[in-house]
Amino acid sequence: DVVVAVGGGSVIDTAKCATLLKTNDGPLPEYEVNTPEDVTAGSIENHTHPLITIPTTAGTGSEVDYWAVITAPDREFKMAIGQPPLYPDGPYLGADVSLVDPELTASLPPRQTAATGFDAFSHALENHVAAGAPELVKPYTRHVMGLVPEHLPDAYETGAMEAREQLLFGSHMAGFCENFAGFGAIHSLAEVTGGMYPEIPHGEAIAVFTPPVMRYNLEEYPARYAEVATAMGIDTSGLSDTEAAHEAVGAVEALIDEVDLPTSLEELGVDEDDLPTIAEKSLETIEIHDNPRDADAAALLEVAQDAY
């Protein structure tokens, strides 16, 4: 009658794809989306099987978004699968009901708490600065960018339920925002790296790429990252947009350090010789199309080298 997904983003994404293939024909790669045109093509023709999602991590927001990420081992690539409703009552990839209870995250170990919590922050960050990000999401993305730095250290260090509740609320809110705004080079590079090195937790790859991508993008869009600084509670009075944007990068790096997340690809065990491939394959992802600053393979290689 219904699929019930209890777990983190990988569990929920797997369940989403199971509900898709229950009611639609073809192998899963036929539903991969790599460009905005792939999304609007409407490859999901039939309503998916009913799905209830129950997240046990505060990170991906997959319980309420229209997307799934599935690794194709033969390609060493993380496929994006997804579709919003393209017309009233149209088919989409996602849950019918989501049950969100912070007590279900109580046993999440510190390392996973840090990685998934930072992933939630990165969703709000990239949704906020994305090319074409609608204004309607920005009150929510601002709130999450303030909420996660406030509560993630406590959740990581003590596991306090109040902190976990706030993180789950932030993750859930950011998940909604994902349905209206895109991501960017952080997720492109991190997902490609995770496809090539499946042992690397997604949130840790996200943490490594976030400051370098911020530095790259703020060169052309400092005002957007100045807003990130304000959202994180930084006093930007008297600062130029560029100065405020660099303060935001510093605050993000401080958060990463505070919860002991990795700070380099070398620390994650990535071979430096793989950086050109990571840059090239990132151009095949759906997320790169919403990066605020244009990026080709050479630019992404520079970002990856900065992350190394």
Over which residues does each language-model region extend?
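C-terminal and late-domain segments of enzyme folds
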Residues: 109-173
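A glycine/threonine-rich phosphate-anchoring loop and its flanking beta-alpha core
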Residues: 23-133, 226-227
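N-terminal small/polar loop signature for handling phosphorylated ligands or for N-terminal nucleophile
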Residues: 1-29, 153-164
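Short, amphipathic C-terminal "tail helix"
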Residues: 271-308
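Glycine-rich phosphate/pyrophosphate-binding beta-alpha loops
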Residues: 59, 172-203, 285-289
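Short glycine/serine/threonine-rich phosphate/pyrophosphate-binding segments
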Residues: 10-16, 60-64, 186
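Gly/Pro-rich interdomain helix-loop hinge
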Residues: 196-199, 203-274
